[in-house]
Design a protein with these regions (language model features):
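A short, structured beta-strand/loop element
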Residues: 21-37
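A generic structural signal for beta-strand entry/edge sites
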Residues: 22-26, 136, 216
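The AdoMet/dcAdoMet-binding core of the Class I SAM-like
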Residues: 6, 21, 40-169, 183, ...
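A short, flexible beta-alpha/helix-coil linker loop
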Residues: 32-36, 145-148, 173, 180
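SAM/dcSAM-binding transferase cores
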Residues: 1-18, 34-40, 58-59, 191, ...
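A generic structural signal for alpha->beta connector loops
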Residues: 89, 114-116, 170, 197-199, ...
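C-terminal substrate-binding/active-site "lid" region of AdoMet-derived donor-dependent transferases
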Residues: 151, 158-225
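Hydrophobic, well-ordered secondary-structure segments
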Residues: 50-52, 82, 123-133, 138, ...
Length: 255
């Protein structure tokens, strides 16, 4: 097990082997699991919500074609590894608040050979507005929310509008939201995204839509209409039981 103290967060980060899956490792921060990485097979994604995000990435461009992707909240760079494995030559950019975290992750869990990743250390919204982050991107992934204690300046309709402006014409914004029943925070974030575009979907384990369980939901939003064939593909891809809300059902869920 390797560890490092994150001065910005005031928490201890650890990376340790996942005994269930050979060649895999878990990143924990403050004792809570944050990321899972399979070094032997980076094209395999363990966490359910991230598998759903990866499934959208699979649909967003022809198979194997490189993409431009912006990761806001880097974690253990699991998705960056996935894109390099499935779309070699992708141009990737990551914004991470904790320099110590990113250094620790890359030192302990090296990126796949050939990974083209540019890293920006700072606040996600500040870097998007004033930094060197320049679109267009085929994917923008925001993965910083864990319920009501989320950074307020990131959980706004204005910020989602800024992120949508970074997309290529057929690009996708993906927002991971962890929440507890009755999913009030997740519903507010979905509503905030819908203020800027009606072309969106909500992805989750189907049981999450009852609002009786804690877990993650993923908002996927576009500037162009949501392809209905994507809904069928995502339902088939899982993880199962997969749920996808669009159109009137999506608006009703947002409230």
């Amino acid at each position: 097990m390797a560890g490092r103290f994150l001065r910005g967060a005031g928490l201890h980060a650890e990376i340790f082997p996942d005994e269930r899956i050979p060649g895999s490792y878990i990143l924990a921060i403050g004792g809570a699991e944050q990321s899972h990485v399979n070094l032997k097979h980076p094209g395999e994604v363990f966490y359910e919500y991230l598998r759903r995000i990866a499934n959208v990435a699979d649909l967003a461009a022809p198979p194997g074609a490189p993409m431009r992707c912006l990761h806001l909240g880097a974690g253990a760079l699991t998705l960056a590894r996935y894109l390099q494995a499935t779309r070699p030559g992708s141009e990737q950019h990551a914004v991470e608040l904790e320099r110590e975290l990113l250094d620790f992750v890359v030192d302990q869990l090296p990126l796949p050979e050939g990974t083209d990743l540019t890293v920006y250390i700072g606040d996600a919204r500040h870097e998007v507005a004033f930094g060197d982050v320049d679109g267009p991107f085929d994917l923008v992934v925001l993965d910083v929310f864990a319920g009501e204690d989320a950074p307020e300046h990131l959980a706004t309709a204005d910020f989602y509008a800024e992120l949508l402006e970074l997309l290529s014409p057929r690009g996708v914004l993906l927002v991971n939201i962890g929440d507890d029943p009755p999913l009030a925070f997740a519903k507010r974030q979905l509503g905030a995204v819908l203020e800027s575009t009606p072309h969106a979907a909500l992805l989750a384990d189907a049981s999450m839509f009852s609002c009786r369980h804690p877990g993650n939901v993923v908002v996927a939003a576009r500037r162009e209409p949501w392809p209905q064939e994507w809904t069928a593909a995502l339902l088939a891809a899982g993880p199962h039981p997969a749920g996808v809300l669009t159109g009137a059902e999506l608006r009703s869920f947002a409230g």
